[in-house]
Amino acid sequence: MNRIQSVFSQLKSQNRAALIPFITAGDPDATTTVALMHRLTQAGVDLIELGVPFSDPMADGPTIQRSSERALKHHISLKDVFSMVAEFRKTNQSTPVVLMGYANPIEAMGYKDFVQTAGHAGVDGVLVVDYPPEECTEWVRYLKEQNIDPIFLLSPTTPESRIRRVAELARGYVYYVSLKGVTGASHLDLHEVGDKLSQLRSYINIPIGVGFGIRDEQTARRIAEQADAVVIGSRIVEEIEHSPAADLLANVGALVESLRRAIDAKSDHSSITEK
């Protein structure tokens, strides 16, 4: 059992949903990113999604696009991202880290070198936004050889054939994009999310996390009543963007602690062990 599977197994036994934050590696700088990762774990997160900065992040809204731009101004490379994970691993061996990004930097490095370096750094999963599951058999094979979980996105418009394909390939968890469009959008329909999760669970037997559009404690709690994990990105990245350097860790920590409390306050009747 790897770190991701271990975390979800423990949470299931406790009837708790996972809290998964997203931050961009190198925003505002590499040293602060590692400090942020540790502050997030202190605030109660269960897994960290670490974005690989990219010049054309097509699935991301303006907030996360700007975070990529800030990181790229510091010339943050894929090698730097691995170094941040390795630095984090020096003192944290338990919190899973999932890299989230786009295909170009991976293909420039090559599948084999990427997964070997990721494995040595302590990466637990990789989500590549623009890899169609129908075309990544070789990619998934390389990941699994290093015991790295391939994470996939599903959306409200994903056809049944692709859902079945993701069910075959995915390991660790599946990330359900709860809105059409880009990250940070609003107008989340919680009833629609619940219906879709019920449908997805007829195909998928690993945990399902829900992200995109979760911006406050009430929505996080409601999602936690239905999903195995709550993924929050844009709201946290906004806090990073607008916080003075001296207050950044404290502000992000306070935000995440409030989200953790909200998620743990989910209704008792909505057991993830019953799903």
Curated annotation (Swiss-Prot):
Keywords on record: Amino-acid biosynthesis, Aromatic amino acid biosynthesis, Lyase, Tryptophan biosynthesis
One Gene Ontology term of the molecular function aspect: tryptophan synthase activity
Catalytic reaction equation(s): (1S,2R)-1-C-(indol-3-yl)glycerol 3-phosphate + L-serine = D-glyceraldehyde 3-phosphate + L-tryptophan + H2O
EC number assigned by the record: 4.2.1.20
Domain of life from the UniProt record: Bacteria
Pathway: Amino-acid biosynthesis; L-tryptophan biosynthesis; L-tryptophan from chorismate: step 5/5
One GO location term (cellular component): cytosol
Entries under Pfam families matching the protein: Trp_syntA
Active site: 49, 60
Known partners and oligomeric status: Tetramer of two alpha and two beta chains.
UniProt similarity note: Belongs to the TrpA family.
Function recorded in the entry: The alpha subunit is responsible for the aldol cleavage of indoleglycerol phosphate to indole and glyceraldehyde 3-phosphate.
Protein's name in the database: Tryptophan synthase alpha chain
